[in-house]
């Protein structure tokens, strides 16, 4: 018996077949047939999706990112054409740079109107191709099942990333005989390359002869679900490991081989030791400029082993002496089997003196100040101290991101959501919304007053969904990171970084969200406890010292061993 359905209904079935449970979206004219079909799939006996109505399409993509980061599934955003889809481009680019699997489905004008500058017509395939893994226009209803299956396969396979589907309106309403499709192979796409055993043997030989090995751990470990394989490798060879910002929860904070965060605002010892190690093992990381500093002088003394699933990352920034191109879920066990048990106690102990120097000059003054206004570090520390085990950290971008990632504690995998590659202000709140739909764990979102106001409309989404986001607003009345750079490198000429802020208490009250403001550190612990024990969303505003600076810091263009502990 024939099963004739519309392209819009076919989309519902195709999403259901991919295991989609949550959709973040905003309706509009060219996507209305899909939203009409969605109506039946979000209520009653047919219910299989939760649709989260955001207040801006950019938030739909960031929420899908947060959902994907924490759940390990593909996030889905659904929007209309024209400004609806152009609003998603920042989120698509963010997902591309941070390897986040997201499928953005957008309405489009009918195929008969393409190229006529019709109302809300945008060449979505053209504008999204450079910032997505695959971008495709669905022109016929019968192509829906194939396109959706292919989109999800590409988004989640290999190095994950965003995929864009441009859904012509006529294809949404056309009827056809439904036939499910499953794409699990694309001839020109090799998502999981098989590693070369010779490369693994050579890497093992280098590691076995190393006196000062250092591992650099990136998000690829989390994306490959290789946290346990990483631990076994590090522990057998006794190798200290630094983590990138996106890889922070790949190794627990309290693991004895964890030596801190990499990067220009990372930990002092691990940055300096990159210039002293004799073997550098990069695992699922891409040698970002925020990690390496000046490439001309970076780790020139070391033999570099690079394990990555994406061949294009090999030799892109740092020349690898040995490359192992494969999923680290497979390559790490193979490497572990060939390395010899080792002890590098003297090398590991050499980190401690530098750690102590950072603790005295930077960490203690930041998290345990004796007087003066509140500092960001002490607020982060207060939240981290009381937060339940497994809490998910979400940050916006700016000083809030740098303080939060430095001083939070990571005990469980997939516990960090932040915009690493693109550095997107306004990311935090919607990403935190997405995270709450991916997990029952506590979600804490740190934002500055600048980023908070870039996504403030999403308080409406939080209100409507009662999403239990614990929002910590670090309010210093400045665009703090830019202000710090102006003070350090631009002769203190604070050009348009001072902010006149609204009354956040009135805003919170308008959205019906519990709120408390802390201006004195004697009230900080009790306010944090109140926030963390609340049942739904909560805004904790903290009045922060205006010139609170993030340290340590590697000045731009300098070497990682030029890291500054004081200004």
Model region roles, listed by residue range:
Residues 1-2, 142, 205, 301-397, ...:
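Phosphate/pyrophosphate-binding active-site segments
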Residues 21-22, 69-80, 85-106, 129-182, ...:
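Structural signature of the thiamine diphosphate
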Residues 2-93, 97-98:
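N-terminal cofactor/phosphate-binding cores enriched in small/glycine residues
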Residues 105, 113-120, 271, 276, ...:
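Thiamine diphosphate
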């Amino acid at each position: 018996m024939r099963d004739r359905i519309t392209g819009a209904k076919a989309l519902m079935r195709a999403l259901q077949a991919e295991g989609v449970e949550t959709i973040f979206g905003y309706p509009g004219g060219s996507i209305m047939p899909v939203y009409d079909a969605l109506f039946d799939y979000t209520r009653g006996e047919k219910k299989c999706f939760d649709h989260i109505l955001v207040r801006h399409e950019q938030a739909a993509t960031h929420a899908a990112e947060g959902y994907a980061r924490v759940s390990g599934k593909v996030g889905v955003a659904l929007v209309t054409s024209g400004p609806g889809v152009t609003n998603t481009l920042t989120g698509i680019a963010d997902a591309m740079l941070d390897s986040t699997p997201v499928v953005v489905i957008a309405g489009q004008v009918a195929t008969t109107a393409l190229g006529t500058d019709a109302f809300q017509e945008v060449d979505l395939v053209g504008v999204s191709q450079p910032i997505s893994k695959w971008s495709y226009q669905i022109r016929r209803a019968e192509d829906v099942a194939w396109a959706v299956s292919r989109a999800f396969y590409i988004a989640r396979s290999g190095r994950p990333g965003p995929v864009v589907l441009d859904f012509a309106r006529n294809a949404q309403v056309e009827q056809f005989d439904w036939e499910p499709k499953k794409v699990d192979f694309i001839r020109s796409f090799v998502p999981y390359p098989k590693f070369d055993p010779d490369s693994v043997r050579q890497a093992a030989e280098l590691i076995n002869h190393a006196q000062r090995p250092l591992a650099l751990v990136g998000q690829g470990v989390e994306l490959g679900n290789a946290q346990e394989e990483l631990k076994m490798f590090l522990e057998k060879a006794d190798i200290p490991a630094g983590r990138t910002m996106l890889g922070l929860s790949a190794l627990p904070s309290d693991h004895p081989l964890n030596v801190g965060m990499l990067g220009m605002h990372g930990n002092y010892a691990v940055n300096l030791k990159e210039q002293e190690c004799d073997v550098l093992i990069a695992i699922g990381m891409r040698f970002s400029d925020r990690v390496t500093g000046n490439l001309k002088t970076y780790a020139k003394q070391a033999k570099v082993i690079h394990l990555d699933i994406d061949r294009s990352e090999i030799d892109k920034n740092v020349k690898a002496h040995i490359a192992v191109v494969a999923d680290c879920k497979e390559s790490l066990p193979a490497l572990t089997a060939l390395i010899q048990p080792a002890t590098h106690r003297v090398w590991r102990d050499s980190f401690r003196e530098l750690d102590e120097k950072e603790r005295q000059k930077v960490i203690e003054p930041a998290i345990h100040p004796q007087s003066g206004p509140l500092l960001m570090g002490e607020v982060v520390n207060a939240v981290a101290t009381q937060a339940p085990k497994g809490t998910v950290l979400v940050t916006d971008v700016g000083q809030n991101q740098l303080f939060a990632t430095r001083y939070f504690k990571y005990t469980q995998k997939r516990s960090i959501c932040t915009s690493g590659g693109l550095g997107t202000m306004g990311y935090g709140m919607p990403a935190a919304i997405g995270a709450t739909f991916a997990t029952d764990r506590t979600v804490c979102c740190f934002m500055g007053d600048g980023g908070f106001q870039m996504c403030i409309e999403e308080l409406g989404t939080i209100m409507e969904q009662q999403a239990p986001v614990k929002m910590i607003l670090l309010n210093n009345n400045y665009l703090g990171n830019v202000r710090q750079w102006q003070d350090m490198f631009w002769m203190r000429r604070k050009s348009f970084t001072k902010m006149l802020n609204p009354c956040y208490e009135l805003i919170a009250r308008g959205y019906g969200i519990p709120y408390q403001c802390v201006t004195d550190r004697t009230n900080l612990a009790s306010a944090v406890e109140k926030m963390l024990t609340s049942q739904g969303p909560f805004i904790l505003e903290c009045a922060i010292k205006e010139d609170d600076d993030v340290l340590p810091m590697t000045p731009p263009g300098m070497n990682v061993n030029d890291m500054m502990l004081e200004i």
